[in-house]
Amino acid sequence: RDSVPMAVQAITSEELEAKNISDFNDIANLVPSITVDDSGSGNSYFYIRGVSDGGFGNRAGAQASTALYIDEQPLSTIGGNPDLHVYDIERVEILTGPQGTLYGSSSQAGTVKIITKKPNPEEIDLGFDLEYGDVHDGSPDRSLETFVNIPLGFIDDAMDSAALRVSFYDLHTGGYLDNVATTQTFQYLGTHSNSDYIELRDDYNFSDKKGHRVRFSNEFDNGLNLDISFLRQEYLSNGSWESDVAEGARKVSRYTPETFEDNFDQVSFTLSGPLTESIDFTLTSSMFERDIAYTYDYTQYVAYTGYDLYAAYYYDYDYYASTDPRVFYTQFDKYDRTSNEFRIQSVTDSGYQWILGMFRETNEQGYQTFYDFTGDLTNSSWVSVDDRWWGQDNIRDDEQRAIFGEVTVPVNEKTDLTVGFRKYETENDFFAQDGYFGNYETTDTGYFEWIGRTNLYQLGDDGVAPKFNIAHRPNDNLLVYGTYSEGFRPSGINRTTGRTAELVPDTYNSDLLKNFEFGWKSTLADGKVTFNGLIYHMNWEDYQSTRYVYNLLTVAYVDNVGMSTVSGGE
């Protein structure tokens, strides 16, 4: 990586194991340019070089500014990345700065690639790790990790270059937050204690995670390589990762149980090999499916009244006076992401190198949100559907198509020029439905039922992201380079209502990050010392900001809010 004229950091399998790296937070601790906004497993997102609007992980928000890959598949999701357990990994690559030409949208500020270990047809290999840890003022952690590598040549001579690698992990993370007794006074219901409704317990926020990965590879006699991989991970947590300072250190006070379930499957297929003597090809297809279900206690919000009916979820609930103060928030998310890429690249020994490819991706995100109550209404003339007092049901379809390429041309024996581009087109469909507890129509039986609002939005966009790089090697121990590159996030659609249509934009434009970078890589003291660095200045134009304004919309929306600059060094 010290010979590549770009900012890249690689964490090897040996370093991952030596430092007991197990999740993305551990990776971020090794990379100064990465910042993690951690709201618990599956609800965290990260950014590189500070390129963030300070968004709060809302599912209706803008796409991520930094891409997460596992092998050849992008996994970044709006509102929170999957919390992949790091085990049996070959290396982790961190590419800082815009990677828009080769990696596309959401690689606006950089890309993190987790590369799994490939099966080895040469030898049988297996191993396992057992861990047990004690959490101060909490419950213990424990984990089991194991892998096995099996060459398949014993099946048939034609399988001499084939192998299967299987890994498995099962982890329990102990809690350290206590759910303690508290009281809350409600305007219509008086004072209630949470101990009347929920079992109070110490170490409230524990979690379990387990998963397995199966990977098969085979190199055929004609030089073709086939690689097939399947990954599944299941995660379940109890409790909250928030704390209430009014109750004391590491304490919360909840009225309803809270859980978070996050399961995903990933399947990938890669075929690669020589197309001609001087050209190789790679064809990859991958699918990613993720299902999330979680509940969140919302009871204490009910204590506040008097806001606009259309902006305050709790108003209807308190106005019509339930006999039970408990309110909870439930959400169901479903992600289906399919990616296909075909690329060819030169494999000559000359300084002239190139890569050319095509990419297509479909990404469907469905999310349902409900604010539910548990008690009976004191005014029996008002009824709700499934005890819900506000709900939304949304399906967001994004499609992206692109062609991309880079070419490196030697200017002279010591200087190379690289030019790249990505021509992309995006299409967005957004089906949205929501409604309040007080939004009713009369049925034949004389009861009322929720009707809500339904909208369908559509949007298309296109653009070109360029890259220019010049690299100069004055001697064998020094490389200096300069880069201009662009990264982007695609345009999108907001859900608006009639009364705020003139205040909230129906759509938002793609934003653009323009990066100017100068760097160097050097070795000193006969190769014993490595000294690398860079400085950068980035202009973030029309940057997308996720906003929530209670008196405008019941959900978050995205707006282009101007230009920002980011400068720094690494």
Task: Label each region the model flagged.
Residues 25, 29-73:
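Extracytoplasmic beta-strand/coil segments of soluble accessory domains associated
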Residues 177-203, 238-255, 297-330, 370-393, ...:
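Solvent-exposed loop segments that connect transmembrane elements
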Residues 58-59, 65-66, 71-98, 146:
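Short acidic/polar hinge/loop motifs at secondary-structure boundaries
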Residues 217-222, 344-347, 358-361, 394-538:
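Structural signature of Gram-negative outer-membrane beta-barrels, strongest in the C-terminal barrel
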Residues 45-47, 69, 82, 94, ...:
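N-terminal periplasmic accessory domains that precede
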Residues 194-355, 360-363, 530-532:
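Outer-membrane beta-barrel domain signature, strongest for Gram-negative TonB-dependent receptors
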Residues 145, 270-274, 278-298, 473, ...:
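Membrane-embedded beta-barrel scaffold of Gram-negative outer-membrane proteins
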Residues 127, 136-238, 263-267, 336, ...:
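Transmembrane beta-barrel wall of Gram-negative outer-membrane proteins
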